[in-house]
């Protein structure tokens, strides 16, 4: 925990050094999340953090060593593709975990429930995805409530696979650049002008 909030786009003005660097609940207790919860959180938030082309935002990252930081409009198709793979891999790991351990439910912070939203209508709308992410990050901008929810591993797996498959289909449909004669390539990213550049 620190001053950064909303995926590095805002500051938690209620945070100070006395609060410390550990996430706390509304009751002041340190919140201890699981590693799995953290992995889900990182990947699900990235799914919703998209630009106008519905690809994951760069947030000023120098992803291609070209120093095009692209803070406002930068989007990475390559990162989006990688996260699609992550979501599928996490779903596979959950299946393996359930088969090996019998664990069929995952406990997570109640604020995360909205990140498990689903449906093509949501997925296809960058505005709706950004709004959902903003709602989530607002819920835990300073503290989390401390309440927990139990979600079946099967429900989480299905959710992750659905998101991964949507991402891959989206890239196939929207990011292929044809050079004719059945040749072409996939766009790699969008620059700070919103142009497909690679």
Q: PLM ranges: what are they?
A:
Residues 1-198:
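Acidic, mature catalytic/reactive cores of soluble proteins
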């Amino acid at each position: 925990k620190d001053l950064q909030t909303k995926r590095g786009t805002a500051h938690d003005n209620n945070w100070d050094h006395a609060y410390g660097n550990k996430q706390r609940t509304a009751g002041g207790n340190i919140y201890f999340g699981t590693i799995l919860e953290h992995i889900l959180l990182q990947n699900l938030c990235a799914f919703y953090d998209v630009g106008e082309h519905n690809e994951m935002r760069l947030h000023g990252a120098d992803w291609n060593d070209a120093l095009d930081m692209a803070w406002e409009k930068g989007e990475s198709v390559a990162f989006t593709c990688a996260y699609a793979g992550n979501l599928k891999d996490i779903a596979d790991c959950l299946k393996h975990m359930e088969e090996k351990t019998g664990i069929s439910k995952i406990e997570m912070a109640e604020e995360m429930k909205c990140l498990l939203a689903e449906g093509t209508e949501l997925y296809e709308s960058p505005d709706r995805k950004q709004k959902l992410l903003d709602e989530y990050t607002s819920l835990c901008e300073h503290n989390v409530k401390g309440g927990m929810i139990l979600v079946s591993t099967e429900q989480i797996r299905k959710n992750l696979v659905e998101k991964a498959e949507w991402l891959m289909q989206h890239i196939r449909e929207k990011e292929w650049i044809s050079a004719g004669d059945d040749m072409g390539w996939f766009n790699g990213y969008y620059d700070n002008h919103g142009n497909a550049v690679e």
